[in-house]
């Protein structure tokens, strides 16, 4: 509707109370402001908007259009944030939605015969009606009750007690596991057991592994507890009803794995009476913190008749062995189940002594006598054979990581003889084996037939008397321990003993050594032996003195001694190292001589523990002079399989001096652990009889500043005495010559001040600087010309390629246009069927794809051409900057060589002959010399230049030309990154260029000008 000009532009007093005066009468039956459904909001500029709210979508929109608004950026008439007051909140909408969802959906009962039926026409007919949630049937009462029962049975399924118990039975909490035996018969009905059930170690959560202090001598019994009668009978009935033959009532096995693995849980079956009165295993009395432990994984339900136990270490034999009732003791109890699951993971028994409290419970008479496990006490013997009369599932226990010799434990498997379990074996393989993954140490595995104590019995002979050193006699070479590495595939892998006790007597020569003369007594010396454990960087309190390190590396069965003396010492201590093995095979001992040196050569021994072969790195340091010190580093390296090696140690004594001569076989280097140092402090030696004749291998001292050494090597400034003007090596002789007062001393000024040497060094320096600048300029020019040539060649190639692509593009475009016309023509006449327009369409598609590819290649080439042009421009600018830097260096060098020349040369006075006649004052002779009364830092540049650089260019050939070299073929890929600013490091800051110098002959101007021309237009 058009309005008159006066109606539109009439001057009226528009107010916010009457917005219709602004927008006119727009009411067409829609929402209006008067009914409260439409609000007015304003933006930041004062523009007004009609706002309505859609309760279904929650969107604010224009009621007279389709525009949606964000009210967070709008304001009301007072300038506050706009709020749509009548808009229902989100909570109200949510409540309505919940109310809508709460209404019963009666359509879900369509098709259920309890609520109706389908008539002949296929339409659903209700047999009653709903009052709220209540179904009221109009059928006869008996039928209605049955239907109602069916309805409730289909709609609501109340959880049974078995389901409630099934959910609780999987929880290993103690308070939940006790009442589980009261409703145990319904466990098999739980569908959760279709998946492999989690088997806990204990039927009662409270019966975790406890500790008893006096468990070293008395080993707890292996108790087999009966299962509840209801557990044996009820699962069969439930299985018959639920038709689940694979469901088995598994004894709840709770694998109590301590985070450190300090205790081994006790697996046992307890009667319900013992469950409720469990006095011996309260949680607070246990020395182990009770925590929910991971439940052992159950493999496919099979009876495992074999069990392979891990070797038992001797450390474990001397410590309490917790009772571990394996699944073998529990499997016969589940006599009514067709399938018996086997625990995959066996809890570890760690050799840390903790008090174990044996859990004893009564044995049920329901279990046959042949199933009862007798008391098994593990003897503390190297090989323990545990024969069990129970069904032993083959469960490989994880190896205990202990650096102790482990011995195998042979377990004799038994065959199930109970009639209940015999039925299980009928449907299962005869020998189902659960292969448990074993943690294999990086060591060669040995068969079960490992000798109990593989000790090299080569040092059982008596050591020399402490007060006397006798002549060593040849003896048989130590027999290395031989192991059979023939492992059969069926043999279970047994961990090799990590520690092979080795005994070495250093004072005795082996078969490969010749007899040596006896050692005479040495000076009286008292040594103090003390053992310290070094931790990483332990500071040494002894003073730093030249040392003689003796490194001894012992292989598996024989030692390896490496000697690297650094400096001869006075009266080296007579020492003896013996690696002795104890019968306990717990901790091998190292017997080290306590150095009690006296006039009679007495030698005593001390033994210390915490020494672990097979690989021992020992380092001996002996300080000379007053404080002699021997440091032995005994390290515990990681076990590395090393073939048995035989080493010979020859102790030679020459002139009362012990000179160790060691021949060692090559053995692998072992990564050593933190070392143990033995410091042997020795008092000063007063006698000179025991002089050392040890061969000294003096290691060269590494230079502190290899960079400076390299720089000096590349320069010609080798004579350092020429550089140092203040060297006082010959000044004393000069002074003595002058003091004699001779009329013609044989000394000239040059000898006094060494200026000739100085001049030669300076000249050589300038020659090197000149050569460096010349070579730098040549290198810069060659690099620039080569890069420029390659880039221009690439530009030419890209331009030619683009021209060819443009021609191909035109041809492909014409072809696509022709094919398009042909396709349209074939579709518009009767030739369509014979022409097969589908082929024409495919050809047109191929032509179009070809056109697009050519166009893409052209655009890429154009981008490359543009980038290369920009690179050439930047390269030219950088080249000019580098050239200017080199020119600056040349100008400074020229100014230095030609600055302020003078005719007189005071250094031409080669002798002091003129001083013979006192007609000339000495001050007048040396007036042209530099005044040395002032310090060097107070000299002016003019004085320095006048004194130093006079006539330096005489005979100095500085050929700075030669920049017109021809461009040689170079590989651009071998160039180093261009760094134009690196030449600034060679700037001479203390020198100023001569403004009058003419360097036009230094550079080839034509080369400089033509080197940066570019032909960037293509």
From Swiss-Prot:
Coiled coil ranges: 782-815, 849-880
Subcellular locations according to the entry: Cell projection, Attachment organelle membrane
InterPro entries: Cytadherence_HMW-1_N (IPR021199), EAGR_box (IPR022466), EAGR_sf (IPR038145)
Post-translational modification (record): Phosphorylated mainly on serine residues.
Domain of life of the source: Bacteria
Gene3D superfamilies with a match to the protein in the record: 3.30.70.3600
GO cellular component: attachment organelle membrane; cell projection; plasma membrane
The species this protein was found in: Mycoplasma pneumoniae (strain ATCC 29342 / M129 / Subtype 1) (Mycoplasmoides pneumoniae)
Cited function: Component of the cytoskeleton-like structure which stabilizes the shape of the wall-less Mycoplasma. This cytoskeleton-like network of accessory proteins containing HMW proteins 1 to 5 allows the proper anchoring of cytadhesin proteins in the mycoplasmal membrane at the attachment organelle.
GO biological process: adhesion of symbiont to microvasculature
Keywords: Cell membrane, Cell projection, Coiled coil, Cytadherence, Membrane, Phosphoprotein, Virulence
Broad class of where this protein is predominantly found: membrane
UniProt-recorded name of the protein: Cytadherence high molecular weight protein 1
Residue stretches spanning the membrane: none
Pfam families associated with the record: EAGR_box
